[in-house]
């Protein structure tokens, strides 16, 4: 019996040895595969780290209506990403809304300011317009908008409405209303589609976070726009991680205007207070902060007739001399900085002027790369 067992054992040994060898080979293969996967993961992580280091993340900050969204639209136009049909229709809806709401504001302001109609028959046009309501916020169809075009045209020609417009610093009115009313014949056509200039002037408050990615000479850029109204500012902190630079936008022409949110606070003072908080935050010690004093086109016109000294008594110089006003504005923001070791980069801009923004951003891009990405050389 024992002989039979020994014989069976000798027969089984080669089979067991082969099985052990196969198991060992499978284990070696699994180990090699695990090492290969680990190398692939390490390589992927390294590429992602390099991409993150190369990414230029620019945060657009500033009070509401300072021009951040317009600047972002310019980046899209300048860097070749066309607006599709859906976007154009959305801009058309916004423009119709801007015109109707802005005209209603003017009709209401004329009444409250006690300005008489030039032509009494325009009162019925005003009543027709004031009866318009869109509480649901639904898009206004071109055919519907056309019904209001005759009333809008007649009202805009009336000197009473024009006088109310000239006193717009006394109430809240969108800055693009005049442009759109001046172009009403074109915009009122049934087949109207917005031009690039129309798109730049279309005003819709930013809610949430809007991003735009583009590449300049192999360097990836991410530009982030966050709503500037007080109710939206708590969202700013969601965007602070990994930022390379902050472009702080200021509406330089609003030194005689108050906030829409509280109707008391001077808009320029509000911008200065926000800037002071941002520029002195320890989170941004190594972040370049560039000041954009925007709406230069409006500042040029306003300086001629509205004295900044009336609203900022510490102003020294000629309140109707553009260079004096510009110097004062820069000084106001510069004084808010506690850390004087870094220079304050600033530019006067007109966000609706594509060539101006193209020129300014070229300089800003170089500043950002020199200050924050000295290890990256543009090809």
From Swiss-Prot:
G proteins are composed of 3 units; alpha, beta and gamma. The alpha chain contains the guanine nucleotide binding site. Interacts with UBXD5. Interacts (in GTP-bound form) with PPP5C (via TPR repeats); activates PPP5C phosphatase activity and translocates PPP5C to the cell membrane. Interacts with RGS22. Interacts (via N-terminus) with NAPA; the interaction promotes CDH5 localization to plasma membrane. Interacts with CTNND1 (via N-terminus); the interaction regulates CDH1-mediated cell-cell adhesion. One of its GO terms (cellular component) is brush border membrane. Changing residue 11 to S: Abolishes palmitoylation and transformation activity. Residues 221-230 are annotated as: G3 motif. One of its GO terms (biological process) is Rho-activating G protein-coupled receptor signaling pathway. The gene is Gna12. Belongs to the G-alpha family. G(12) subfamily. It comes from Mus musculus. This is Guanine nucleotide-binding protein subunit alpha-12.
């Amino acid at each position: 019996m024992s002989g039979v067992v020994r014989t069976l054992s000798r027969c089984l040994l080669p089979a067991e040895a082969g099985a052990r060898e196969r198991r060992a080979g499978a284990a070696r293969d699994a180990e090699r595969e695990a090492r290969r996967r680990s190398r692939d993961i390490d390589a992927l992580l390294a590429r992602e780290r390099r991409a993150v280091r190369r990414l230029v993340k620019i945060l657009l900050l500033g009070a509401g209506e300072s021009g951040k969204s317009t600047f972002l639209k310019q980046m899209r136009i300048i860097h070749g990403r066309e607006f599709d049909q859906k976007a154009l229709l959305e801009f058309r809806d916004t423009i119709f809304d801007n015109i109707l709401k802005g005209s209603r504001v003017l009709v209401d302001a004329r009444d409250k300011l006690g300005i008489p109609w030039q032509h009494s028959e325009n009162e019925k046009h005003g009543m027709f317009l004031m009866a318009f309501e869109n509480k649901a916020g639904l898009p206004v169809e071109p055919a519907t908008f056309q019904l209001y075009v005759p009333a809008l045209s007649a009202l805009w020609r009336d000197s009473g409405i024009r006088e109310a417009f000239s006193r717009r610093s006394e109430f809240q009115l969108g800055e693009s209303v005049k442009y759109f009313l001046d172009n009403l014949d074109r915009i009122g056509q049934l087949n109207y589609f917005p031009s690039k200039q129309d798109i730049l002037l279309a005003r819709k408050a930013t809610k949430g976070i809007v991003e735009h990615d583009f590449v300049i000479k192999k360097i990836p850029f991410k530009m982030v726009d966050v709503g500037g109204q007080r109710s939206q500012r708590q969202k700013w902190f969601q965007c602070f991680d990994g930022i390379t630079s902050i472009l702080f936008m200021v509406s330089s022409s609003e030194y005689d205007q108050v906030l829409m949110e509280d109707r008391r606070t001077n808009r320029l003072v509000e911008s200065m207070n926000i800037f002071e908080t941002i520029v002195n935050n320890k989170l941004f010690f190594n972040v370049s902060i560039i000041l954009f004093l925007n709406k230069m086109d409006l500042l040029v016109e306003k300086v001629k007739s509205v004295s900044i000294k009336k609203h900022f008594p510490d102003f020294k110089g000629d309140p109707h001399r553009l260079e004096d006003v510009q110097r004062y504005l820069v000084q106001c923001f510069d004084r808010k900085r506690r850390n004087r070791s870094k220079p304050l980069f600033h530019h006067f801009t007109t966000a609706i002027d594509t060539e101006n923004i193209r020129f300014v951003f070229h300089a800003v891009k170089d500043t950002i790369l020199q200050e924050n990405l000295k290890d990256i050389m543009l090809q």
